């Protein structure tokens, strides 16, 4: 059980929204917030992460929206990757077999698509397509979301790479 911080909603690194929670103070009455209930009640729907016990700029714990989504889908905030050997990003080898398709709603729920669309549009990228790429590795198939974004749409390669990295928040 947590109590709510003031303000309730903060803008964190990268401009992402976080709901602020604090440990309750001993002997002080408070409105109880239960994280597992909050996911279903509003966090998942609104596209918010959670910051816990923020002191200065240092939280005890930070849950991205992707962590919230993982909890909604799998009832755990973190799931270890099933395959540790990921293929090189961005390059499909000449003889590599891949499958490209539309991600299902169970893999990428409409609420997540909406939050990603809003983020992309906020940063000036309208109509971005998202696909699911399945690649074979020595450990079996691995699935990755891909976006029709190109380095030419950004000021330089580091800005492009940083933006792609920021999509990991979801």
Feature roles, as predicted:
Residues 1-170:
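An interfacial alpha-helical scaffold signature
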């Amino acid at each position: 059980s947590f109590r709510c911080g003031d303000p309730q909603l903060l803008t964190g690194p990268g401009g992402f929204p976080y709901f602020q929670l604090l440990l309750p103070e001993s002997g002080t009455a408070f409105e109880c917030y239960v994280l597992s209930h909050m996911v279903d009640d509003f966090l998942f729907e609104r596209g918010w992460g959670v910051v816990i016990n923020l002191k200065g700029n240092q939280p005890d714990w930070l849950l991205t929206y992707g962590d919230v989504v993982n909890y909604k889908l799998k009832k755990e905030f973190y799931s270890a990757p099933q395959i540790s050997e990921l293929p090189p990003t961005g390059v499909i080898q000449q003889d590599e077999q891949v499958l490209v398709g539309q991600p299902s709603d169970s893999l990428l729920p409409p609420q997540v698509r909406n939050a990603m669309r809003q983020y992309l549009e906020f940063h000036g990228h309208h109509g971005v397509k998202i696909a699911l790429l399945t690649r074979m590795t020595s450990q079996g198939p691995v699935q990755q979301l891909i976006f029709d974004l190109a380095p030419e749409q950004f000021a330089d390669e580091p800005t492009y790479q940083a933006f792609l990295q920021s999509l990991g928040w979801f």
